[in-house]
């Protein structure tokens, strides 16, 4: 059956106006831009023809026919994809319109093909019942054209599904309703159509009665008018009424014949509905039985497969169980060995902890001894200093006593000389008193005494005065020289006493260090400790010094690198740099202190090494018991390391076996699930009814065309 595309375009335009979209759709020119068709498709399925797709169609409203053609191509592509992916109806090439003719010339024939595809999408979507009801509200001629277009589209899409062998010899109306519904709803639609026909018959019978009543009333009026009115007017009215009566009779006859035809058709449809219901019930029962048998077969097949897999799994589990028991026995043995080793380790740790506590006490006592030695050295230095001061004071006291005796003797001699001079002066004093009245002036008396004294005595007196002055000067010089010599002597004595005290302290410290080394050796021998070789101690100290030197060099390099990278900074940055420099200086001071401490340690180690040299001690200091303890400790450490390695290997092997078991169970479960999914997968749809069922029951995701574009395409 072929439908005129121009007539089809007009009817589909009438059907398209039932969607009430905003763009005009009254003429082919209105539809050439594609906007109205896009809005209609958006109403048909908003999830596929979504707002983004609609916005892409409505972006440019330019009158250019090339833009129209591009939009129509996009609409046609979306229609083909929707029919193929969602509805399961691939569009044949003969139904594809030429969009260039539509966009440029508004060709009604090509536009009819495009609207026919839109109609196919409308009657196959989820809201198809609503759109079919809209079609039923149109005029009869429009309904007829639309139904023929649907039949043509469905017939050319699935030619084998419309054969008389499958569906019987239905009339046009029943076949149209068949293509608009599914097999499950076919009987309901036929029954509904039968009820509609009955309602139409009732309406026609009522209309017939009304017409009969009206005919009787008209006849009465005609009879009265013949009596009352003039003959000419009556004849005209009579002719008019006769013609109307004939028309009504013909209409009545036609309605009666159509009623009889409808009644016969209704009876035939009732029989067909009953037959179809019986066939449907039989087929439904058979399909249910077949499905039940198929499900039972699938379950039995799955159960047998699962039983085989479980048997294989059981055998492997039994084998693994034997291996696991062997491993448990080995683990139990290892645990017992580990328990013994742990107990031995605990005892050794206890001994080591006691040795550590004794070593800590020894270190504390050694520090106390060192502090007391330092205090004793300070007190000894103070005592030597005070002793030296006391000796100096005693010598000074002796010198002062001798000087006092010398001064006393000199005083006595001067006192005698004074007495002699006083006696010599008493002789002329009498003469001076006798002649006082003659010359009362004292200057005259003195001159007179000087003249009376003998010349020898006067010369002796002058000589004694000069000698006295010279002796006083010589005594002052001798006293200064004596004081200087005494000062040098005191300094030399002080240095000598200091050196003697330092020598005594060094000798005492050396003896104390030797005693400490001997005590340390005895303590290590008693505790079973491990005495390090002097060369090993020296090597360790050298390593520490080397590490300290390397750290100092690294710090110096970092400081130089920081100075090279230092940019011009503000006050806050300068303050930060100063803080960093202070911290670096502190670290340098700490490093220097550490280096000084290591140097002291090196000095002490050297003294210890010197004390431990064969020249100063007998060669048999290390006893055989000490060697025995050292070898036992080494063997014990070796056994502990071996046990730790065995335990780590067993733990790793157990973890690997557990991971292998878990992965095997997981792989087996995934394989069973995959096989069950393949067995329960539905057979490929080969008929139109199966395609309709799959299309109706398809569940599309929220993403619409983006989600469905990822689904595999159906093969027909």
Curated annotation (Swiss-Prot):
**Which cellular component appears as one GO term in the record?**
centrosome
Residues in domain Calponin-homology (CH)? 6-122
For this chain, the family text in UniProt reads: Belongs to the hook family.
Where expressed (tissue)?
Expressed in brain, cerebellum, kidney, liver and heart, with highest levels in heart and kidney (at protein level).
Q: What is this protein called?
A: Protein Hook homolog 2
- In the record, Phosphoserine modifications are located at 163
Region listing for Sufficient for interaction with CNTRL, in residue ranges: 582-716
**Which parts of this chain are annotated as the region Sufficient for interaction with microtubules?**
1-546
Instruction: Give the source species.
Output: Mus musculus (Mouse)
What keyword terms does UniProt attach to this protein? Coiled coil, Cytoplasm, Cytoskeleton, Golgi apparatus, Microtubule, Phosphoprotein, Protein transport, Transport
Q: Where is this region: Required for localization to the centrosome and induction of aggresome formation?
A: 1-161, 533-716
């Amino acid at each position: 059956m072929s439908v005129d595309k121009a007539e089809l375009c007009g009817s589909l335009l009438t059907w398209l106006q039932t969607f009430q979209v905003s763009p005009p759709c009254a003429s082919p020119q209105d539809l050439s831009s594609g906007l109205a068709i896009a809005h209609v498709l958006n109403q048909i399925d908003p999830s596929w023809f979504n707002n983004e797709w609609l916005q892409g169609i409505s972006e440019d409203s330019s009158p250019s026919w090339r833009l129209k053609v591009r939009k129509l191509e996009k609409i046609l592509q979306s229609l083909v994809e929707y029919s193929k992916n969602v509805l399961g109806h691939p569009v044949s090439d003969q139904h594809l319109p030429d969009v260039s003719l539509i966009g440029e010339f508004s060709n009604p024939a090509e536009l009819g093909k495009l609207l026919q595809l839109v109609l196919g999408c409308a009657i196959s979507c989820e809201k198809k019942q609503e759109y079919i009801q809209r079609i039923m509200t149109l005029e009869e001629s429009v309904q007829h054209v639309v139904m023929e277009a649907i039949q043509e589209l469905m017939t050319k899409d699935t030619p084998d599904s419309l054969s008389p062998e499958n569906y019987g010899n239905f009339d046009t109306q029943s076949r149209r309703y068949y293509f608009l519904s599914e097999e499950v709803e076919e009987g309901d639609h036929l029954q509904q159509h039968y009820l509609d026909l009955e309602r139409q018959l009732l309406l026609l019978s009522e209309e017939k009665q009304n017409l009969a009543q009206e005919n009787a009333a008209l006849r009465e009026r005609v009879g009265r008018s013949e009596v009352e009115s003039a003959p000419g007017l009556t004849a005209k009215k009579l002719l008019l009424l006769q013609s109307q009566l004939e028309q009504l009779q013909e209409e009545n006859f036609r309605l009666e014949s159509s009623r009889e035809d409808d009644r016969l058709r209704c009876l035939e449809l009732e029989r067909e509905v009953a037959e179809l219901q019986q066939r449907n019930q039989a087929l439904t029962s058979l399909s249910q039985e077949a499905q039940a048998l198929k499900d039972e077969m699938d379950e039995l097949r799955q159960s047998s497969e699962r039983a085989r897999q479980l048997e294989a799994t059981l055998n492997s589990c039994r084998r693994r169980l034997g291996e696991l028991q062997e491993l448990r026995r080995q683990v139990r043995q290892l645990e017992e060995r580990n328990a013994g080793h742990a107990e031995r380790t605990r005892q050794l740790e206890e001994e080591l902890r006691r040795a550590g506590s004794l070593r800590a006490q020894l270190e504390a006592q050694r520090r106390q001894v060192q502090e007391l030695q330092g205090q004793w050295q300070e007190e000894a230095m103070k005592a030597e200093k005070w002793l030296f001061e006391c000796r100096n004071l005693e010598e000074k006291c002796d010198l002062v006593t001798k000087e006092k005796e010398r001064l006393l003797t000199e005083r006595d001699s001067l006192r005698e000389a004074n007495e002699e001079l006083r006696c010599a002066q008493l002789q002329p004093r009498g003469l001076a008193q006798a002649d006082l009245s003659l010359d009362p002036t004292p200057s005259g008396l003195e001159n007179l005494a000087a003249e009376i004294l003998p010349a020898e005595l006067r010369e002796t007196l002058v000589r004694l005065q000069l000698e006295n002055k010279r002796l006083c000067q010589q005594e002052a010089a001798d006293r200064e020289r004596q004081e200087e010599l005494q000062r040098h002597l005191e300094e030399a004595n002080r240095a000598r006493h200091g050196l003697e005290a330092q020598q005594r302290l060094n000798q005492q410290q050396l003896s104390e260090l030797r005693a400490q080394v001997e005590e340390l050796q005895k303590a290590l021998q008693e505790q079973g400790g491990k005495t390090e070789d002097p060369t090993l101690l020296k090597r360790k100290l050298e390593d520490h010094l080397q590490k300290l030197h390397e750290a100092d060099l690294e710090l110096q390099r970092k400081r130089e690198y920081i100075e090279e990278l230092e940019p011009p900074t503000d006050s806050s940055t300068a303050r930060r740099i100063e803080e960093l420099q202070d911290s670096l200086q502190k670290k340098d001071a700490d490093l220097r202190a550490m280096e000084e401490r290591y140097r002291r340690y090196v000095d002490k180690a050297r003294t210890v090494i010197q004390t431990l040299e064969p020249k100063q001690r007998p060669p048999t200091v290390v006893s055989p018991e000490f060697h025995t303890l050292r070898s036992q400790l080494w063997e014990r450490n070796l056994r502990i390391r071996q046990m730790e390695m065995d335990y780590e290997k067993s733990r790793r092997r157990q973890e690997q076996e557990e991971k292998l078991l878990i992965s095997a169970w997981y792989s087996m479960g995934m394989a069973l699930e995959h096989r069950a999914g393949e067995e329960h997968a539905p057979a490929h749809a080969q008929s139109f009814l199966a395609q309709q069922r799959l299309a109706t029951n398809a569940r599309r995701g929220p993403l619409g065309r983006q989600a469905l574009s990822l689904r595999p395409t159906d093969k027909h």
